[in-house]
């Protein structure tokens, strides 16, 4: 039976702990840089926390489950996640990106990625014909929906059909709706981006970023890159984000209720 997202937010952690960690409700913080082994040639599966850490892996399993992906990777910030994602592309590749994006993403694309030879076309993806901007060297479409800051909404499913037709990756920043209200992978996206600093964390006390995918080839590439670049999220920050996720449902419901009330007030007063 499929689980409701509220159940995933809370009980995935409890079930794993009941088997492996003495029944503790909260997953332990493995604040260790290195790990001992039983003997020569015998490994616990953990060597060095830049490569793998149990607390980080547990958080990644949770986020992958929330987004219905096969793998999620936790980063030190949302921009660290996007920066690593750009390593999928090489000089001469072209990306179509939404005209309204988070300022940090625009800065990365315009001042770092372009310097490295990647080309961009900025398109209002919520209203323009994206297919008209596809070139021979186009490799991906990158959007936010809703966008930051203008809250433009793009039809992910329709855009996914265009991307698949032209063999392009569809990358969706899902920060503003969170997995509680939207699952881009279910609508045809290949990669989901999150700033965990926002709704996933929810307490304004830590930075985090995530990449989620439902493709084995992309997962393998991301795993190689995160081990190589050392951009993984620290154990204590993983604990804080995991704590925040437990209340994701109630927080998102309240945010939605507040937004509806604000909309009613604006319409009632005639303020525009």
What is each stretch, according to the model?
Residues 17-18, 72-271:
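Conserved PLP-enzyme active-site core in the AAT-like
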């Amino acid at each position: 039976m499929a689980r409701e997202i509220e159940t995933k937010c809370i009980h995935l952690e409890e079930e794993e702990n009941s088997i492996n960690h003495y029944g503790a409700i909260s997953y332990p913080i493995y604040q260790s840089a290195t790990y001992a082994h039983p003997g020569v040639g015998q490994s616990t599966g953990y060597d060095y926390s830049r490569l793998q850490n149990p607390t980080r892996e547990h958080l990644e399993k949770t986020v992958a489950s929330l987004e219905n992906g096969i793998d999620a990777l936790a980063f030190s910030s949302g921009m660290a996640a996007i920066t690593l994602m750009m390593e999928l592309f090489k000089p001469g590749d072209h990306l179509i990106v939404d005209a309204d994006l988070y300022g940090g993403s625009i800065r990365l694309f315009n001042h770092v990625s372009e310097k490295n030879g990647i080309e961009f076309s900025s398109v209002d993806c919520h209203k323009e014909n994206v297919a008209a901007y596809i070139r021979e060297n186009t490799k991906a479409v990158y959007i936010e929906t809703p966008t930051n800051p203008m809250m433009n909404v793009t039809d992910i499913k329709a855009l996914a059909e265009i991307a698949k037709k032209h063999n392009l990756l569809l990358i969706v920043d899902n920060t503003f709706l969170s997995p509680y209200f939207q699952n881009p992978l279910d609508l045809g996206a290949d990669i989901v981006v999150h700033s965990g600093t926002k709704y996933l964390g929810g307490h304004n006390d830590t930075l985090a970023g995530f990449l989620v995918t439902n493709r084995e080839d992309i997962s393998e590439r991301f795993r190689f890159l995160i081990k190589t670049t050392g951009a993984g999220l620290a154990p204590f920050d993983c604990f804080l984000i995991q704590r925040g996720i437990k209340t994701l449902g109630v927080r998102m419901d309240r945010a939605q209720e507040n937004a509806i009330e604000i909309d009613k007030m604006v319409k009632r007063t005639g303020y525009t």
